[in-house]
Amino acid sequence: GDGTVTINEVLSNDLAYDHPTAYALNNIYPNPFNQITTIEFSVPDNNNEKVRLRVFDIAGRMVRDLTNRPYTSGIYKIEWDASHLSSGIYFLEFRVGSLRDIRKINLLK
């Protein structure tokens, strides 16, 4: 299969943290990871742009399209199960409109 993707909204008592002011790829943990990693990102108020998260292998082939939809304001976590993939270096692309952030992730089995 394609693995599992779980999307959760993170809640916090810190008001500034609950209401981000910009789109951002915050954290990927653990990294390196053995099967499951968590990707955290922020979505600001008054948005209607789609958040797209994709994973590419070292050769530039897309191996997973994690999400491609608008989100309401908040901090989100996506858990990605990569157990069906081989060990190696992968690249996570976070894209919203003209914003593009790429991070290297390392799958160790």
Language-model-detected regions and their locations in the chain:
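C-terminal tail/sorting-segment detector
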Residues: 65, 69, 73, 79, ...
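A detector of low-complexity, intrinsically disordered, Ser/Thr/Gly/Pro/Ala-rich segments
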Residues: 2-4, 19, 35-36, 103
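A structural detector for beta-sheet-dominated domains
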Residues: 1, 8, 26, 42-44, ...
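Short, glycine-anchored, charge-dense loop/turn motifs used at functional sites
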Residues: 56-63, 90
